[in-house]
Amino acid sequence: MNMANFLRGFEEKGIKNDRPEDQLSKEKKKILFSFCEVCNIQLNSAAQAQVHSNGKSHRKRVKQLSDGQPPPPAQASPSSNSSTGSTCHTTTLPALVRTPTLMMQPSLDIKPFMSFPVDSSSAVGLFPNFNTMDPVQKAVINHTFGVSIPPKKKQVISCNVCQLRFNSDSQAEAHYKGSKHAKKVKALDATKNKPKMVPSKDSAKANPSCSITPITGNNSDKSEDKGKLKASSSSQPSSSESGSFLLKSGTTPLPPGAATSPSKSTNGAPGTVVESEEEKAKKLLYCSLCKVAVNSLSQLEAHNTGSKHKTMVEARNGAGPIKSYPRPGSRLKMQNGSKGSGLQNKTFHCEICDVHVNSEIQLKQHISSRRHKDRVAGKPLKPKYSPYNKLQRSPSILAAKLAFQKDMMKPLAPAFLSSPLAAAAAVSSALSLPPRPSASLFQAPAIPPALLRPGHGPIRATPASILFAPY
């Protein structure tokens, strides 16, 4: 079937007929007969039809039809009705099932596919198990039905105290349980509590009688108030003297507001200080003496019962083998009223190990060292090996060294000498046996001088004695 010749003749006939009705019929016929049923391709012009009919794919399909074999369905993109067109555009339907284009498109103005909106919720509703599907299946359904699921925002986990961001909950949990976070939280709590405590002291200074505000109609209460006011006024001028006495004794100075309350001065002050430190440690979960942060009260109790904490307490009190001494020039720092663990500005001496340290950090390092632990446990000292020999003070070892050197200074046996000297030494030992070997090897003149004549070379007649000595 020669389609190109048929279309040429059809165009020549159309050129002769110039009427508008003939032109419309010509366009319709062109649409009808510009479709290749063999290759299932829509052609837009006679030139395309000619190029297609001369192509290899069209000839191959025509040959297969003539031989009685069904042609394979052509696979191409669905955009076959493009204006430019190509030689091999097809749709997914086979040639036998596909209807002519004119029947599907009554006019050229109608679009080939009508777009209709697809509701994403209804599309997801078609699949009841959409949320439990695999990610690959969800992606396929979203691509085919146009369901757009908004991407989930990554949850940002951050610590506002430490100014850190985390990638997971486990990282955040580990950070919250750590010591760095606990220290920063405690520092923030301390800064928040300080402004609350300062105005109370200032108010106590400004109004010394503010603690005696309740006034009743009884005369006895008024007399008690007057007595307390007198006691407070008398205690104010003597506060400087008591402060200087406390500084001389080496204890921590009391704040100036503490002198106004007579109950604090009369009662036992050190007991209340220890209790306040314990309460602060329980509240903050922090040991200010050892500078250790814990996560629970059980850990704090275990730390307080440990040997390190006990030795630090003994060093502060001076009751154990570790003694503390004030460092020179530390009184000026103590006058500033800086509160701490009580171990600042001090030097320490460990009586067990006979070691002097200069600071609290060095004391902690010494307490945690193996040397101190072995001494406390009563283990013997391990010898230290060094490449340098130190002079030992004991006279017995020095005497042994001298005796060893004298023994090594004895002359050598003749077997260690060269061959001519060895023969001479053997003859002399056979003829004369002296009681003690002297510095010279040959004493008796029994050997003729011809044997002792110096030979050629480096051999000498009377060589010096060879001695072995330590390095």
Swiss-Prot record:
Keywords in alphabetical order: Apoptosis, Metal-binding, Nucleus, Repeat, Zinc, Zinc-finger
Any Pfam family hit: zf-met
Domain of life according to the entry: Eukaryota
Region Required for induction of apoptosis: start-end pairs: 1-93
Biased composition regions of type Polar residues, renumbered to the chain: 206-220, 260-269
Assembly and interaction partners: Interacts with p53/TP53; the interaction is direct.
Protein name: Zinc finger protein 385B
Annotated source species: Homo sapiens
